[in-house]
């Protein structure tokens, strides 16, 4: 019988967890896009996050909150505007910035999706106890810090000519 090698097991688990982030995102998008009728999963997320602000957020704020580029958010917002779900208006603070304001039609979509949202959360977390959800929430916060460390690591590698 081989001796137990914790280091190998931990490294393997890190690799699985890392790739799992991508797999989980892909699965979530594929499932939701298959069943959402009027908008994509990403468009819905942009609307829900924009609606959470007291005042319409600008594209850069949404990009930062959603972890993607401003250009990506603009592309999603333009398609939502064409469908009548949002209005893109110049920021009062900076006329060069565009703010995403949810229209009445968009608010209707968000309101109608609240039941869906409950079912999504209920399904995804069905096998979790409240304690496990609290722990997962805590660990997700640590993972978010890890993304910051990863960004710094890549930046330093690039500055040092390692990339």
Residue ranges of model-derived segments:
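N-terminal leader segment of winged-helix/HTH proteins
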Residues: 1-38
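Hydrophobic alpha-helical segments that form the core
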Residues: 16-19, 48-49, 140
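Alpha-helical linker/hinge and terminal dimerization helices associated
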Residues: 24, 28-32, 66, 109-128, ...
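N-terminal helix-turn-helix DNA-binding core of bacterial DNA-binding proteins
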Residues: 29-71, 83
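Charged, amphipathic alpha-helical coiled-coil/dimerization segments
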Residues: 78-141
């Amino acid at each position: 019988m081989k001796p137990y090698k914790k280091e190998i097991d931990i490294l393997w688990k890190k690799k699985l967890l890392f790739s799992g982030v991508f797999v989980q995102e892909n699965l979530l998008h594929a499932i939701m896009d298959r069943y959402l009728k009027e908008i994509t999963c990403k468009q819905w997320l942009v609307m829900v996050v924009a609606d959470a602000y007291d005042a319409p957020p600008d594209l850069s704020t949404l990009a930062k909150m959603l972890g993607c580029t401003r250009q990506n958010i603009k592309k999603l917002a333009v398609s939502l505007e064409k469908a009548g779900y949002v209005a893109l208006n110049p920021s009062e603070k900076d006329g060069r910035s565009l703010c995403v304001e949810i229209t009445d039609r968009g608010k209707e979509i968000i309101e109608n999706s609240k039941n869906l949202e409950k079912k999504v959360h209920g399904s995804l977390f069905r096998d979790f106890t409240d304690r496990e959800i609290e722990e997962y929430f805590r660990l997700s916060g640590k993972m978010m810090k890890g993304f910051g460390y990863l960004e710094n690591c890549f930046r330093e590698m690039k500055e040092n000519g390692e990339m």
